[in-house]
Amino acid sequence: MDRRIFGLENEYGVTCTFRGQRRLSPDEVARYLFRRVVSWGRSSNVFLRNGARLYLDVGSHPEYATPECDSVRELIVHDKAGERILEGLLADAERRLHEEGIAGDVYLFKNNTDSAGNSYGCHENYLVGRHGEFSRLADVLIPFLVTRQLICGAGKVLATPRGAVYCVSQRAEHIWEGVSSATTRSRPIINTRDEPHADAEKYRRLHVIVGDSNMSETTMLLKVGATDLVLRMIEAGTTLRDMTLENPIRAIREVSHDMTGQKKVRLANGREMSALEIQEEYFTKARDFAEKRGLRTGAVDRILDLWERTLTAVNTGDLDLISREIDWVIKYQLIERYRAKNNLAMSAPRVAQLDLAYHDISRNRGLYYLLEKRGMVERTATDLEIFQAKSVPPQTTRARLRGEFIKRAQEQRRDFTVDWVHLKLNDQAQRTVLCKDPFRSVDERVEKLISSM
């Protein structure tokens, strides 16, 4: 697929520290966070003017789903806009708490595990054609996704019976199946529930739930960009070596526990390969594919360059090559500097605190944003683009229609209902427009509906 629709959903961890007598449960904190949303949207599940969806997920986790984007860079801008929107709700909730005499600070973490060992996710969505064989797509993708953490993990200090260790991925410990239609009960690598949010005869939505949530824009670029290239190869029928894993679930944990990428995992055919070798195989094929197909645009070149440098860095152990660009390395080096300075063991509570503070989305407190302010991390988006994306939808996808419809309906104080495919005015006529094509950003039916308000 030359032009693909992408979407990211991030669930955020909520916590609150209190200095007074009154303590609030995560549920109550989440209600404070969403009070402003509920006051104008009459629900804790709303679509916004930028085409995105914001809602309170199971277990009081706020979740932000980006609008449909047709470029990886735009996807990153909109994912970051989601962080900024939630940061705004955070400030609001703290102000409300203080007005009610409750002394406390609310924290939102863009990570994947809390201190109680619960996991919440970052789900990636890729639109794929209906014609291909979905099971083949999944088979070829699983070895890629199991080892992909090496290039885009968020890193985690994991407590084990033998002491604390630094792992590459946060999500790896919480994945229990390869392919499944459930997301919460059994966490698979690829979720097969068939909800394309588009013309079901033409499209399917590939729902990848194995990835970590990323703070780094460049890590996000590599995560989604490399996956898109692998998908394009599979769609084009490129022959790839059979790297089916004997036990993907065991492999995903083994890969996460090995920062060198050298440890061998068993393949279904009895051979053994390291995570690094598996990634190098996909990378080489993707680079040759991009070359042959004339796909070497600036954006693709940047993805391939970062992919290659990351594999070189892991292979040689020279992590400085990617110390400004890949989350798990940025965080690892931050922790190592701190440990050396304070003579701390990996298991020290202050190290665990640092691990968590990296993911704090508050730009005044979060460690990732402290590094960003100091110019210590690379960017792909600008602050202005992110600010605009808080209220302006992508202009080249269906999100534009949804965003314009919501904006007009709110301005005219009209009662309306929207989801990913429907736009409905709740008046006598109950007029509804069904938008099945996610690539269409212009539709006279929607324009008619908007101008009738």
From Swiss-Prot:
GO biological process, one term: protein pupylation
Binding site for ATP: R53, T66, W420
Annotated catalysed reactions: ATP + [prokaryotic ubiquitin-like protein]-L-glutamate + [protein]-L-lysine = ADP + phosphate + N(6)-([prokaryotic ubiquitin-like protein]-gamma-L-glutamyl)-[protein]-L-lysine
EC number from the UniProt entry: 6.3.1.19
Enzyme class per UniProt: ligase
InterPro entries in alphabetical order: Pup_ligase, Pup_ligase/deamidase
A single GO molecular function term of this UniProt record: magnesium ion binding
Pathway: Protein degradation; proteasomal Pup-dependent pathway; Protein modification; protein pupylation
Binding-site positions, Mg(2+): E9, Y55, E63
Catalytic residues identified in the record: D57 (proton acceptor)
UniProt keyword terms in alphabetical order: ATP-binding, Ligase, Magnesium, Metal-binding, Nucleotide-binding, Ubl conjugation pathway
Record's function text: Catalyzes the covalent attachment of the prokaryotic ubiquitin-like protein modifier Pup to the proteasomal substrate proteins, thereby targeting them for proteasomal degradation. This tagging system is termed pupylation. The ligation reaction involves the side-chain carboxylate of the C-terminal glutamate of Pup and the side-chain amino group of a substrate lysine.
Family of this protein: Belongs to the Pup ligase/Pup deamidase family. Pup-conjugating enzyme subfamily.
Additional detail: The reaction mechanism probably proceeds via the activation of Pup by phosphorylation of its C-terminal glutamate, which is then subject to nucleophilic attack by the substrate lysine, resulting in an isopeptide bond and the release of phosphate as a good leaving group.
NCBIfam families: pupylate_PafA
Name of the molecule in the record: Pup--protein ligase
Organism of provenance: Catenulispora acidiphila (strain DSM 44928 / JCM 14897 / NBRC 102108 / NRRL B-24433 / ID139908)
Lineage: Bacteria, Bacillati, Actinomycetota, Actinomycetes, Catenulisporales
Name of encoding gene: pafA
